[in-house]
Amino acid sequence: MLTIDKWGRKPLLLIGLTGVVISMSICTYGFKQATYQVQQTAINEIQQDAPSVAIKLTPLTNDIYYSDVEFKRTLKTTLTSDEYDAYQQPLLTSSINMNAPLVLFGIIAFVASFAMSLGPVMWAMLAEIFPNQTRALAISLVGMVNSLTSFLVQVVFPWELANLGAAATFAIYGVFALVSLILVAKFFPETKGRTLEEITEEFERSA
């Protein structure tokens, strides 16, 4: 917020969205390069509580999987439904071989990019881009759509991870960010230092 009047709204949005695209690409690459292999140490731990499960998993120690979806699909066909529900997460955690610092950097970069641009700047721009006669209603509608979208993302995210995989999930969000970057660069006006009437006139000319 300290730089919003100094740098302008649109530059901050472009910088933030560029950061989101890059961070999502980093996460996508990190998960795309990951491999999965059941470790003997994990089987030894399971052996203490469920010997039958350990016996089923032992042949998988010779296989390497290059997708979390493929790995989880194999676990589903190897184990019963109850066994899969009980051991899927610990097996996934112990079996993954990935560049964790790279993915962590991507996630932190996303949080930073969002916090410096989309988070605060969006609400500042909403108060400036709508005409006076419809501003209150428009901001309310946008707020409702934003809340609904956030809710849907939280609901859909686990399904995406389970069915599409982590790499594809982050790639999808990266594509949405890239589309947003293009739309902001092409259609959004800079509102810094301009009156509401001037902004409204520019939208009317563009229409």
Which positions does each model-derived feature cover?
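Alpha-helical transmembrane bundle of multi-pass membrane proteins
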Residues: 1-207
